[in-house]
Amino acid sequence: MTRKSRARILTAASIALLTSSADLIAQAPAKPPLPDAPIARLIAQSAIQSDTQPVIPAPSAVTGQSPAALASTQPSTSNPRLTRAEAEAMATKKNPRVTVARLLALAQHQVVRETRAAELPTGLASITAVDADNATRISAGSLTSSRLFEHAGAGGGFTQLITDFGRTRNLVASSKLQEKAQNANALATTEDIVIATDQAFYNALQAQALLKVSQQNVDTRQTTDTQVNEMTKNKLKSTLDSSFADVNLSQAKLLLLDAQNNADSTMAALDAVLGLDRQVTYELVDDNAPLQPPPPDVDNLVQTGLQQRPDLQALHYDQQAAVKFSHAQHDQLFPTISAAGTAGSVPIRPAEYYVANWWGAIGVNMNIPVFNGFLYTSQAKEASIRAEAASEQSRNLRDQIVRDIRTSWLAANTAYQRVAVTAELLKQANLALGLAQTRYQLGLSSIVELSQAQFQQTDAAIGNTNAQYQYRLALATLNYQIGATP
């Protein structure tokens, strides 16, 4: 075999080896992406396609906009519009937890009236008619007057507590404090529903925005896939480029499914907070207000929270009510003095047994506790211990409020700083994507580099959008922690 023949064989073998390697790479399955949020892998919207040379889509102006601008890029649908303020008002009106808390407060007011009834006189009236054999006697049963007479009469009586040395007064005071505690709990429940509504609203708003981005991502990847496949047919790009474009399109479709499921789930959560028993899909409207930095002084926020938090006020009232009830239990050891009276008329009566046709009497009674197996002393001790426990519960919640306000303030500051950082990151990602597109169009880089730049740009755009929502939610959480009235 001549040297020239050997050179031809080696050249042909090298070309065959390179061709088979390229085909193997193109046919190899794409490496599965690392588990991450779907929003981290969304792709930007494509630009207008050129007539002569296929152009890779430019960075989407939509994904780099604010959440409100992103929502406004889509045509309005027939779904009802809903703002955050409207959602809060609807939730506080229709959510069953708020209704239950208000009803319990109304019920506690009736407990106050029930307790106060012991201080008021009790009156009753009676009408009695008896048909009996005169002078016969009851010989079995309870210990009562044994003689029976035919008679008919009507009368009335009353009882009035004179004093029980403060027991009833302390019971009334305790029930009034419990009513205040229940009203504070109702307000705390309302604030819980408001913050839950804000969380559900922003989650659903974010999910709707990401659903629109994912749909644009599918359109972009479809355009890119069509362009690259056409260039591959014309021998302008390799099979590897076409394979990467197909993989990116499949990933975009999967992300669209995830985004749709996330949007439906968050909307279902919002419907539940709003107190709806059916599915209603709203078109959520952001307030589009400029972002303001959080308050600079956390100590003032702590003092405000300790003064305004309704759940802390409820525990204070509960502790005071427990103290009053403890005093009332101690007062059981004192005597109880009450008055009683009765009067009436007997128009039908046997004259030989009745000296008058009416009766009347009034008197005063004193009950003095002597011994009942240490019941009163044990009840008094139990009430004192429970009052101390209520005081410690109030102190524990106070410490938690101080901690929660400080951590919420730190989270709000961090979220506010992330808005500026993610905006700068988005700016740099847009610049990097533009350079990567230019290099790919000039044939200086592969589609892998372009895809990586597109991923980074989309990740930065979604991160900037998320940062704005997270800061709004962080401010709402901070207002909740300081007890701001919704």
Give, region by region, the residue ranges found by the protein language model.
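Periplasmic alpha-helical coiled-coil/stalk elements that build and connect Gram-negative outer-membrane
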Residues: T189-T304, A411, A415, Q456-Q457, ...
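Alpha-helical heptad-repeat coiled-coil segments that mediate oligomerization/polymerization in large
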Residues: S238, I401, S408, G443-S446
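Small/polar, glycine/serine/threonine/aspartate-rich low-complexity segments that form flexible
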Residues: L70-P80, S126-Q160, L284-V298, H327, ...
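A glycine-/polar-enriched beta->alpha junction
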Residues: A89-T99, L106-T122, G156-S174, A184-E191, ...
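Transmembrane beta-barrel architecture of outer-membrane proteins
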Residues: H151-G153, Q199, F244, W359-A361, ...
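Acidic, low-complexity, intrinsically disordered peripheral segments
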Residues: T2-A12, T19, L24-D51, D133, ...
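Short segments within alpha-helical structural elements
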Residues: A117, Q251-L276, A415, E424-A484
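Bacterial Sec-pathway N-terminal export signals of envelope proteins
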Residues: A26-T128, R278, V285-Q319, V370, ...
